[in-house]
């Protein structure tokens, strides 16, 4: 029955994707009153170095909310209210943001962009028995040992292997500089999986570390040149990405510069201009994929919805027709949340958690959704994107690894 309900939800979603409803993103559901309200917590960074990605995930969540602002529980309609907490891109501040959501009485949480904040907040959600649905946080530690944390995107062991295979087999980069942010869970974790797969393939990835907040990468670039590395892999934030690209090209380094899902952000192309050559990164989704029927409908509806509001446009990088792949992750996480609430016929966290564990929703934007025993989405698909003429464009597809 739970699976049937979820499938029906997906059908309703597909039929309604052409709609472009919405409201004030800062007051989503705030006008809901009475007992028939269910609160969904939005645990995302709107400040700090990951704010750009967090805002794009929130756009996906809010667009999904505009299409389905209510849920049905035991035959009665409940209004969804979105409750926001800024984790500030900081794992030290993330527990406070999580506690804010818990104290507000949310039934389920969505987020976050940035694995470190998810890892830091996870135990609080688990202790409070409030399920959380990760969006683009890819570190395995997010869900490991936490039966209340799920996620809709793929995880770093897969993503790291994809990018190592791409570097080694498609770009002939077998001796890579691995630039990571010291102490950052996402950067170190993702980099480690890239390094492991590169070594398995017969290549090498040498770690070059920098400190959080560092802006001068001249020492690292000098090492890249002197050691003759034929590729750079840099699993770093949006802000840092632009600096690494610009400083590498200014130093005369021409080798491919590669990364992961965080780089799927138009602001990187905007900030680096004609220096953004030979840039490649993995992503959850590509708007140019014409085989994705749900994706085509999403692109059409989301583009119109973003264009209707200046604040949405600003949070989307100032354009309506460019969609970061983390935005569909936000969308899919919201649909998973409301699907689980309806399948559970409850606003109680433990019941929603159990419904999530059994949930199957076909035809979401990043693919069919089903969770494994760890709460991770079962995914074996990724796209590779590049930057051309100031735009992020599709390059290739990975469907499984040998």
Predicted feature locations:
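Short, low-complexity disordered leader/linker segments with a strong preference
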Residues: 1-39, 70-76, 103, 398-402
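An alpha-beta-alpha
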Residues: 149-212, 230-231
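Segments of small-molecule ligand-sensing domains
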Residues: 307-328, 338-391
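Extracellular/periplasmic periplasmic-binding protein-like sensory domains
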Residues: 250-329, 386-388, 392-394, 398-400
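Short beta-strand elements at the ligand-binding edges of bilobed clamshell
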Residues: 86, 142-166, 207-209, 273-288
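Extracytoplasmic "Venus flytrap"
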Residues: 34, 41-62, 85-91, 114-116, ...
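Extracellular/periplasmic bilobed ligand-binding domains
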Residues: 191-288
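Beta-alpha junction/loop-to-helix N-cap segments that form part of ligand/metal-binding clefts
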Residues: 24-32, 52-59, 71-143, 152, ...
């Amino acid at each position: 029955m739970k699976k049937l309900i979820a499938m029906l939800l997906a059908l309703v979603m597909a039929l309604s994707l052409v709609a472009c409803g919405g409201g004030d993103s800062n007051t989503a559901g705030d006008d809901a009153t009475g007992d028939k309200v269910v609160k969904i917590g939005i645990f995302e960074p709107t400040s700090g170095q990951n704010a750009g990605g967090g805002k794009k995930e929130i756009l996906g969540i809010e667009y999904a909310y505009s299409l389905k602002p209510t849920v049905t529980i035991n035959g009665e309609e409940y209004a969804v209210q979105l409750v926001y907490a800024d984790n500030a891109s900081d794992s030290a501040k993330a527990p406070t943001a999580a506690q804010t959501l818990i104290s507000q009485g949310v039934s389920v949480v969505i987020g976050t962009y940035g694995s470190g904040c998810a890892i830091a907040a996870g135990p609080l959600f688990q202790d409070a028995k409030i399920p959380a649905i990760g969006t683009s946080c890819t570190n395995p530690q997010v869900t490991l040992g936490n039966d209340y944390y799920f996620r809709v995107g793929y995880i770093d062991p897969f993503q790291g292997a994809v990018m190592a295979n791409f570097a080694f087999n498609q770009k002939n980069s077998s001796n890579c500089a691995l630039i990571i942010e010291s102490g950052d869970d996402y950067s170190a974790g993702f980099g480690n999986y890239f390094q492991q797969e590169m070594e398995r393939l017969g290549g090498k990835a040498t770690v070059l570390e920098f400190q959080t907040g560092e802006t001068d990468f001249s020492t690292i670039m000098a090492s890249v040149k002197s050691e003759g590395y034929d590729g750079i892999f840099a699993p770093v934030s949006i802000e840092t990405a632009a600096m690494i690209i610009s400083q590498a090209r200014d130093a005369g380094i021409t080798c491919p510069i590669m990364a992961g899902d965080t780089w799927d952000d138009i602001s990187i192309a905007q900030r680096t201009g004609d220096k953004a050559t030979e840039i490649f990164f993995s992503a959850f989704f590509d708007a140019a994929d014409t085989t994705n029927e749900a994706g085509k409908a999403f692109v059409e509806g989301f583009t119109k919805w973003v264009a209707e509001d200046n604040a949405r446009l600003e949070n989307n990088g100032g354009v309506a027709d460019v969609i970061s792949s983390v935005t569909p992750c936000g969308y899919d996480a919201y649909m998973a949340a409301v699907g689980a609430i309806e399948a559970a016929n409850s606003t109680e966290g433990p019941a929603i958690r159990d419904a999530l564990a059994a949930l199957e929703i076909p035809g979401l934007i990043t693919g069919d959704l089903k969770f494994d025993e760890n709460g991770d989405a079962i995914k074996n698909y990724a796209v590779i994107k590049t930057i051309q003429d100031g735009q992020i464009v599709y390059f290739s597809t990975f469907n499984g690894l040998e």
